Design a protein with these regions (language model features):
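Preference for intrinsically disordered or flexible, low-complexity segments
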Residues: 1-147
Length: 147
């Protein structure tokens, strides 16, 4: 919709704008053109982790990074003073298979009850975990929400 170029790859997930946008090309997302043209965003600027002091870095997840679909409000994790890469939907089984379950539980965001929920989560279930990875140190983090 944004540039008019022919592409066989396009984005159809969340994009928040006044206009109803059918699809966006990856190039227009990456260079920020889609967000600029439609005055839209891929992520709510209040639904991101604290700890990123550089306001320029907020532009990346909001205007130049494809969002993901969650049950409730999507949330973008941060670590080492920067926003993380989103890796995908996971449950406890996938976290164990990747060898990162213990790592994601080592997160001050989660209390013991929430850690138990992560340990029992099922990918595609009523409690969904979303896996992120720090761009600087490689640490894995999750966000979770309910249907």
């Amino acid at each position: 919709d944004s540039c008019g170029k022919t592409t066989h790859i396009f984005y159809t997930a969340p994009f928040y704008a006044f206009e109803d946008i059918a699809y966006l090309c990856p190039e227009c997302i990456a260079n920020g053109e889609a967000a600029r043209i439609y005055d839209g965003s891929f992520q709510d600027d209040f639904s991101v982790d604290d700890g990123v002091d550089d306001p320029e870095k907020l532009d990346e997840p909001i205007h130049r990074t494809p969002g993901y679909s969650g049950w409730q409000q999507e949330y973008w994790r941060a670590h080492c003073g920067d926003y993380c890469a989103y890796l995908g939907r996971v449950g406890a089984r996938e976290l164990r298979a990747l060898g990162v379950l213990v790592e994601v539980l080592d997160d001050p965001m989660w209390d013991e009850e929430q850690k138990d929920m992560i340990r029992e989560s099922v990918n595609g279930g009523h409690l969904q975990c979303y896996l992120f990875q720090c761009l600087h140190c490689g640490k894995h983090l999750v966000w979770m929400d309910f249907d």
